[in-house]
Regions:
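Helix-start (N-cap) detector for alpha-helical repeat units in TPR-like alpha-solenoids
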Residues: 7, 23, 41-42, 75-79, ...
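Register position in tetratricopeptide repeats
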Residues: 19-20, 53, 87, 121, ...
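TPR-repeat structural position
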Residues: 23, 57, 91, 125, ...
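Structural marker of alpha-solenoid helical repeat scaffolds
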Residues: 36, 53, 69-70, 104, ...
Length: 428
């Protein structure tokens, strides 16, 4: 098979072939690409699309399994899985796939629209209405911001930043553009800029709930807990009975050290949504920090009872350090770790909890295997590269020379006080 000299050009040709219905040509291109680079994500994705249209369901599933293994948070892989399962009549599986697709990439209009149809068929009117509203929201975005959202959630953050900045130069007060650029800044660790953008956007559109939720998150990341709690209070004043707002108010109260208020509001959420696993886990965290360990254990275990795949609940139990898993719990965690439809981060959390369970039993080989699996799974979602870090170090060495510092002699603060650098967990 002839090697592909320009993979990007070949992918564009494959995409054009798919769009024109020439799946044979598209298949030839993707086969050639994968022969030279079996882990090429876009080639695997297009190969799966071709296989679905050509009726080669087993091949499509194989390509998607490989793609999800390489990139567990690649939303389009789950969207394609949803299309395939829907075609095969597995409507429940299709719903699960489309739900994961929108979780990993909320810009996928096709997934939202498919969910709206499938929810409607199942008689779930509220969920159908929400999914349709989400599809309409994405559709209404300027095309540039649709692209920004897609780039963000497929890991191309710098490309997303370029488009967002260019858009805001033309539309400087577009609050969704400001929100997306703040999201990019937060992902890149530039929290101060993100805070300024969101504060400005909230001033422009104070009734925009998503803006304020993002603002709260950035304030928390900057450890401005009182300010985050104040913003959560604004949402609570707007709709005191809204469980989403109650949950955020509880979380910010916990961060601010007011555990009684936090626990009270977690209970209010659970009264409206009994057995909500995320709230049970959050309540467990609050109880643990408050020193009420036995109640924390009960809350975590309640979460695993209603949602056995809730990985952070199992991890919460393990992270207590003093909790010992029973044999039945070990078996349940092993079953969930092997389940096909579990979220990726839940699988990561369960792997580490399994490591703790095996370690407590003295089965060190099994413990090391579980820890290794957890680290390998986590590594799949980490886009860190040593090349990037080396480039940053080289740039610092090139710019920050002895001459640079000598030229700045005499500047700075003359105070002799020692400087303590805080906020570096495990730095020692």
């Amino acid at each position: 098979m002839t090697a592909i000299s320009d993979p990007d050009l070949a992918l564009r040709d494959a995409q054009k072939a798919i769009q024109s219905g020439d799946f044979a040509t598209a298949r030839q291109i993707t086969d050639a690409l994968l022969a030279g680079e079996p882990t090429h994500k876009e080639a695997l994705y297009m190969a799966a699309v071709c296989a679905r249209y050509e009726g080669r369901s087993a091949d499509a599933l194989a390509h998607l399994d490989a793609l999800k293994s390489l990139s567990p948070d690649f939303g389009r892989a789950y969207q394609e899985e949803g299309h395939l399962k829907r075609k095969l009549g597995d409507l429940s599986g299709a719903v699960g796939a489309f739900e994961r697709a929108t979780r990993y990439n909320p810009a996928l209009m096709a997934s939202w629209s498919a969910l709206a149809d499938l929810y409607h068929q199942a008689g779930n009117t509220d969920a159908a209405t929400n999914a349709r509203a989400q599809a309409d929201r994405v559709r209404a975005l300027p095309r540039e911001l649709q692209a920004v959202t897609n780039h963000i959630h497929e890991g191309r953050v710098f490309r997303a930043e370029e488009i967002a900045r260019a858009f805001l130069q033309k539309h400087p007060t577009h609050v969704e553009g400001m929100r997306l650029l703040a999201d990019i800044g937060s992902r890149l660790g530039v929290q101060e800029d993100a805070e300024f953008l969101l504060e400005s956007a909230v001033d422009l559109d104070p009734d925009n709930v998503q803006l304020r939720l993002d603002y709260i998150q950035v304030l928390r990341k900057r450890q401005k807990f009182a300010a985050a709690l104040e913003q959560a209070g604004v949402l609570m004043a707007r709709d005191p009975d809204n469980p989403l707002f109650q949950s955020h108010f509880a979380i910010e109260s916990m961060q601010a050290g007011d555990y009684e208020t936090a626990l009270d509001h977690f209970e209010r959420v659970l009264q409206k949504i009994p057995g909500d696993p995320a709230t049970l886990v959050s309540r467990g965290h609050a109880l643990k920090t408050y020193g009420r360990t036995e109640e924390a254990i009960s809350s975590y275990k309640a979460a695993t009872d209603v949602a056995p795949g809730q990985g952070d609940a199992w991890y919460g139990l393990a992270n207590l350090k003093t909790y010992t898993f029973g044999d039945d719990e070990l078996a349940r965690m092993q079953a969930q770790f092997a389940a096909l439809d579990i979220d990726h981060m839940s699988r990561v959390h369960i792997a580490f909890a399994l490591g703790k369970a095996h370690e407590d039993r003295g089965d060190h080989d099994a413990a090391f295997l579980a820890y290794a699996q957890g680290n390998a799974l986590k590594h799949q979602t980490v886009r860190y590269t040593t090349d990037q870090m080396h480039a940053e170090f080289d740039a610092q060495k090139a710019i920050c020379t002895a001459d640079l510092f000598e030229a700045q002699a005499g500047k700075g603060c003359p105070a002799p006080d020692p400087i303590f650098i805080l906020g570096l967990p495990r730095a020692g």
